[in-house]
Amino acid sequence: MTDNKNRPAAGILGTKLGMTQVFDEKNRVVPVTVIKAGPNVVTQIRTEERDGYSAVQVAFGAIDPRKVNKPVAGQFAKAGVTPRRHIAEIRVADASSFEVGQEINADVFEEGSYVDVTGTSKGKGYAGTMKRHGFRGQGASHGAQAVHRRPGSIGGCATPGRVFKGMRMAGRMGNDRVTTQNLSVHKVDAENGLLLIKGAIPGRKGGVVIVKSAVKGGAHA
């Protein structure tokens, strides 16, 4: 396994292709998520001296140039690259190792390193408290009258006389930005631009994800 603490921070935008299973060196089944990683292109560089922090802005995905507004088109023109659909800024330890127009591919990661994957979770629509928050519901019998899936009390009448902010209630479920931390990179297929990451990641098939070096440095390695 690779220790992230001794490696520079890295990141890449990609597309979730789905899940499959592979075998490790001991013939054990390993569930993996396949990500089409990149190619990304560096469109802007942030430095400590000028911006107060170190990061690179990367772009990913094809788009018709006619669908890009003028400010964004000007940003791409300044970088000397064709317009892309998605833009993200990724913090790095040393931005001087990057340059505008540089291409970033799947080989930015090594097998055995640990990553954090950010995506948009699947939308579930309007959901009640039992599905959305895991409430147990109320009694199934013994006088329970049409309250089996209701949440119960949401606050007092006179004191406090209001519903506190953050009260867990029914509402839209999913379609949130979610990050899963400390996932192991099982395999890097640089030739096909694929990352095989052990375990599940947020989002649907075809969803755009950001893969970054684990901020906790592979805490469970």
UniProtKB/Swiss-Prot annotation:
UniProt keyword terms in alphabetical order: Ribonucleoprotein, Ribosomal protein, RNA-binding, rRNA-binding
Quaternary structure (record): Part of the 50S ribosomal subunit. Forms a cluster with proteins L14 and L19.
Record's function text: One of the primary rRNA binding proteins, it binds directly near the 3'-end of the 23S rRNA, where it nucleates assembly of the 50S subunit.
Record-stated family: Belongs to the universal ribosomal protein uL3 family.
Single Gene Ontology MF annotation: structural constituent of ribosome
Any one cellular-component term (Gene Ontology): cytosolic large ribosomal subunit
Source organism of this protein record: Nocardia farcinica (strain IFM 10152)
GO annotation, biological process: translation
SUPFAM superfamilies assigned to the protein according to its UniProt record, in alphabetical order: Translation proteins
Annotated gene: rplC
Keyword Phosphoprotein part of the UniProt annotation: no
Protein name: Large ribosomal subunit protein uL3
